[in-house]
């Protein structure tokens, strides 16, 4: 097989459904032959290792461990799904305290064992806040760490494609910004369906509101249908994000990134923005939309600030004014 790089990729939470799918996707896409599977659950990660070995990918060097030092040392790229999954009846925010403690330890391990890592993708919920926690604790630069947000946009894209009976890739500009949660801002003004603006497609306001609701509840719908949280779609999107950071195809769907921007009025949060991920990291631009869309984005930002302040109160991260002491790059 030909590989994009030989650098070490670590999959955290590799014993779970998302983690194991990420391992397989990374190998099928030919990202790197050197992949370390890390999890605290020995039977699970051992089982994934055996299955991946039994796929018989040629030329690969797949290892597994439950030791963080062994896993992280020498890592250049990391994807972490190493948090508790959402269950039926739960919101992403319900996972806040426990998963942010996991994210803090994750960030500490990066700082301790692989400070030279190139890029990190965090996908366990609530992803905006777990990623922010990991960034603060890791000491990394903001452009080196991203969180999963694209899944909300692909859910919106899917819903519109089904609505109008077109191939999904014929729907463009279907993006959500702000938080990866029930307060996400769903933007319609730049959507085109087979090249035609959504505003010209005859979609009623009532139907648009239904599609928005379906998008926001996309993760809950999967849980109801399958009896477990999504794993194929977050795994694939996360692997495509790290592929871009390795120098592969640029990732242009929205990603969660650190924003501290006076002009935009968004300060000290991780949030989904119009972004590009490439070999140099993640870069965001100013969102454009209607007055109503931008107001919903402001509301989403305020919700993210509230969750950020909660983890400060819990002592998981220090007060904002002290972040630079923990991470001079912020």
Predicted ranges, named:
Residues 8-9, 120:
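Conserved hydrophobic helix-helix packing surfaces used for dimerization/oligomerization
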Residues 6, 31-75, 309-312, 316:
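Conserved N-terminal Rossmann-fold NAD(P) cofactor-binding segment
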Residues 15:
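Conserved glycine-rich cofactor-binding loop
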Residues 28-34, 139-142:
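Conserved S-adenosyl-L-methionine
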Residues 138-144, 153-330:
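C-terminal substrate-binding/catalytic lobe of Rossmann-fold NAD(P)-dependent dehydrogenases
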Residues 91-159:
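Rossmann-like NAD(P)(H) cofactor-binding subdomain of soluble oxidoreductases
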């Amino acid at each position: 097989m030909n590989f994009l790089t030989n650098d070490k990729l670590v999959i955290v939470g590799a014993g779970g459904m998302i983690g194991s799918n990420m391992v397989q996707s990374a190998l099928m896409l030919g990202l790197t032959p050197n992949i370390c599977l890390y999890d605290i659950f020995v039977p699970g990660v051992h089982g994934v290792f055996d299955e991946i070995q039994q796929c018989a990918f040629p030329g690969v060097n797949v290892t597994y461990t439950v030791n963080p030092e062994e896993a992280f040392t020498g890592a250049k790229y990391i994807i972490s799904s190493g948090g508790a999954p959402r269950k039926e009846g739960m919101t992403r925010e319900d996972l806040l305290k426990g998963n942010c403690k996991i994210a803090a330890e994750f960030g500490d391990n990066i700082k301790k064992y692989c400070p030279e890592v190139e890029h990190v993708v965090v996908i366990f919920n609530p992803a905006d806040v777990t990623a922010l926690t990991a960034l603060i604790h890791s000491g990394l630069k903001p452009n080196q760490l991203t969180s999963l947000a694209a899944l909300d946009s692909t859910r919106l894209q899917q819903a519109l494609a089904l609505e109008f009976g077109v191939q999904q890739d014929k729907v463009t500009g279907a993006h959500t910004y702000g938080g990866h949660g029930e307060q996400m801002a769903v933007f319609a003004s730049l959507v085109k369906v087979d090249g035609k603006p959504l505003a010209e497609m005859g979609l009623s306001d009532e139907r648009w509101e239904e599609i928005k609701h379906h998008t926001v509840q996309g993760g809950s719908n999967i849980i109801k249908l399958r009896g477990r949280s999504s794993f194929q779609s977050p795994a694939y999107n996360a692997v495509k994000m790290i592929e871009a950071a390795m120098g592969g195809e640029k990732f242009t769907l929205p990603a969660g990134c650190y924003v501290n921007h006076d002009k935009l009025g968004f300060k000290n949060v991780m949030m989904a923005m119009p972004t590009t991920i490439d070999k140099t990291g993640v870069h965001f631009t100013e969102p454009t939309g209607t007055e109503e869309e931008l107001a919903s984005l402001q509301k989403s930002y305020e919700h993210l600030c509230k969750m950020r302040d909660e983890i400060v109160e819990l002592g998981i991260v220090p007060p904002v004014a002290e972040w630079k002491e923990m991470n001079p790059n912020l």
